């Protein structure tokens, strides 16, 4: 279904996206007061909405709180750290995430283990899933193909490293078909490889 509200921020730098989301979300909250801001995951919109809500004295609940990679070069890691630093209620997906929050001095009365909501959603909808249109065309068999996603800046922005990664994947997966839904960021790098 289509969202009720779409800020239509689009792409841009991390700062541009964050600023645009905050401006739109602040206007929305001022026109439609809320008792709670619920954010999910480690995307820029979660961080931007959490900051905006807290500035308006609206408590924040974070689903997938406490997840850490330790890689500060990832925008998602910055988003996680900032969001969790201003969250009131933490909904965690694992004991590791809960422990990460405890180490950051978050008290147990603010941490709620809920499990992996993405996997729960997938499992609840399994009967609705059907093979994609290309399933028969490529004669795919369950467990006999690989799905590849590449979109993180650290994986796709450096052309030489990206090319080396693709060649390595190609060598390692020769006997299995690779399904590669291409992210716009990745498509841009792929087009530069061709040229």
Predicted regions mapped to residue ranges:
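Residues at the starts of beta-strands that form the adenosine-phosphate
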Residues: 59, 110, 177-178
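Phosphate- and divalent-cation-binding pockets in alpha/beta enzyme and binding domains
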Residues: 47-48, 100, 121, 188-190
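Short, hinge-like loop/turn segments at secondary-structure boundaries
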Residues: 1, 55-57, 77-81, 108-109, ...
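Donor-nucleotide binding loops and adjacent catalytic segments primarily
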Residues: 1, 130-195
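A nucleotide-sugar donor-handling region in carbohydrate enzymes
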Residues: 9, 86-160
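Active-site and donor-binding regions of nucleotide-sugar-utilizing enzymes
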Residues: 5-105
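Generic structural signal for well-ordered alpha-helical scaffold segments
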Residues: 26-30, 123, 135, 170
